[in-house]
């Protein structure tokens, strides 16, 4: 374990986190937990939390040596689970576990996380990086994300609101997102992947926060679901 490299990485994280913090969050870099305020404009606020990863899409990123978008996937997989319940993402935390800390590689991953938070309009308030050479094989890593959002109680999207006669709308995906990659890797095992296919495979998961929240603000949604991983 390279302590000096880890310390340098923490400084890099701190600089990025400060850029993505808003006035609702206390400046608590170096603390044991992140602190935030509940929006005062909400009369009966409910907190919605979600955690997720990006599955074996990580192996595609490793194979293509492209790490600057996998962080966007991580944010997307978490915040997209918040918005289908009517919540507006407020803050995000990440967990990176890796065989050996390679600063440039992990910086690119984190840059993607920061970009994802910017798209989702939420704050990156903390995280954890674990270097575990005895657990992960050479060059291997894994990611986990944690997102929290707020919603007014009456605006929660619950299945009880869905009724017969409702109009069903399907929103297209931007690609494979972050599901089904075990099958994809099986199909392309021991085969040369064409450049165009490579580009599609690593395309980041679309973050639907702006679109869904805008519609929900006008009370136009009774129910919402992510049709990924079985729906």
Regions found by a protein language model. Give the residues of each.
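Helix-biased detector of long, well-ordered alpha-helical tracts
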Residues: 1-231
């Amino acid at each position: 374990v390279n302590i000096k490299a880890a310390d340098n990485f923490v400084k890099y994280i701190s600089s990025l986190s400060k850029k993505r913090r808003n006035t609702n969050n206390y400046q608590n870099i170096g603390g044991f937990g992140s602190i935030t305020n509940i929006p005062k404009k909400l009369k009966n606020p409910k907190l919605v939390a979600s955690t997720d990863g990006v599955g074996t899409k990580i192996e595609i990123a490793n194979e293509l040596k492209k790490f600057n978008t996998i962080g966007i996937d991580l944010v997307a997989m978490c915040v997209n689970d918040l918005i289908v319940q009517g919540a507006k993402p407020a803050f995000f935390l990440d967990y990176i576990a890796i065989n050996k800390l390679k600063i440039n590689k992990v910086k690119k991953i984190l840059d993607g996380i920061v970009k994802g938070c910017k798209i989702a309009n939420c704050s990156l308030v903390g995280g954890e990086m674990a270097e575990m050479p005895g657990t992960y094989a050479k060059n291997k890593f894994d990611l986990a994300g944690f997102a929290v959002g707020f919603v007014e109680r009456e605006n929660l999207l619950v299945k009880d609101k869905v009724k017969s006669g409702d109009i069903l709308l399907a929103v297209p995906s931007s690609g494979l997102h972050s599901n089904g990659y075990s099958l994809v890797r099986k199909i392309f095992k021991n085969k040369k992947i064409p450049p165009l296919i490579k580009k599609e495979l690593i395309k980041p998961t679309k973050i639907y926060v702006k679109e869904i929240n805008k519609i929900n603000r006008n009370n136009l949604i009774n129910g919402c679901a992510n049709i990924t991983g079985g729906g």
